[in-house]
Amino acid sequence: MRVTYQTLTLTLGSYHYDIALVLRDALFVNSIMSNSEVWHNVQLKHTQAFEKSDQILLKSIVNAHAKTATEAFYLELAVLPLNYRLSVRRFMYLWHILHRDGDELIRKIYEAQKCLSVRGDWTELVEAEKAKYGISESDSEIAEMSREKFKSKIQKKIEAHAVRCLNNIAENHSKSEQIVDYDFKRKAYFTDRRFSKTDVQLLFALRTKMLDCKTNFQNQYAEDLSCRFCKDNGNIEDEDHILRCTVLNNEKYDVKFSDVYGNIDQQYKAVQVYKTVMRRRKVYLEIIQKSS
């Protein structure tokens, strides 16, 4: 993908994620959704196809593991799944139609579809989405609204619905339950200039429970979750134990795994410690692999 290539080859420093998401919108979303507001007979399988591509792109932007929970990208980055973006476009096209003169062809087609609609018609999609998002305004009321007022109203309702759905998924997913957040804003670590590109990637992996430790990939390690380094069966290899493992560490750190869900200062401190430990851990893993 052009977006991935450009963000990987450009030296963007601490602005990497800001620019990557701008490029996502400009080069990917606007391209793949060109004229999508007029699509009719749109089914779930159609939106899933381009959402899958978007999810691959988001994973590449944060260099995430392939099995990372999908909802995590949207909640951490505060970006909407593309089917909700499509809904916004469709409603704005409705506003456009309702502001045309009654004798214009586009308005005549709309009025005819309303009177003689069949399954899959564009007007049917609009009515279904009005009910879905709780948009009660009639055509005449929409026609009286300014573009800015109508867009602001529908964006708020669609975003609120999307956030509820994403958090409902996260609440029932063990890897995402800690990042449930109804305040739909990009997490501060993506924009805090203290965090390097790799710091952000490490913190994202920690917060989504995709760090390379046995408890995060239990199917891979069957029933043996003991630490690969200290070999103590009483020590399960999880994010907390990595900080305390006597083989990996010769000092005690004043951080704990839960700090990755704390405030931005706690997150920064935790990432610096994890970065040091994971660097040392990588060396030990290479030694183990060579000797096995």
Stretches found by the model and what they are:
Residues 90-201, 206:
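Flexible, low-complexity interdomain linkers flanking nucleic-acid-processing modules
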Residues 1-114:
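Non-catalytic, peripheral interaction segments enriched in hydrophobic/basic residues
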Residues 62-71, 137-140, 262-270:
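Short, surface-exposed acidic
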Residues 18, 49, 56, 68, ...:
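Exposed alpha-helical structural elements
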Residues 21, 50-51, 66, 75, ...:
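Active-site-proximal structural scaffolding
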Residues 18, 40-51, 140, 144, ...:
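Generic detection of long, well-ordered alpha-helical segments
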Residues 11-14, 170-292:
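Family-specific functional microsites
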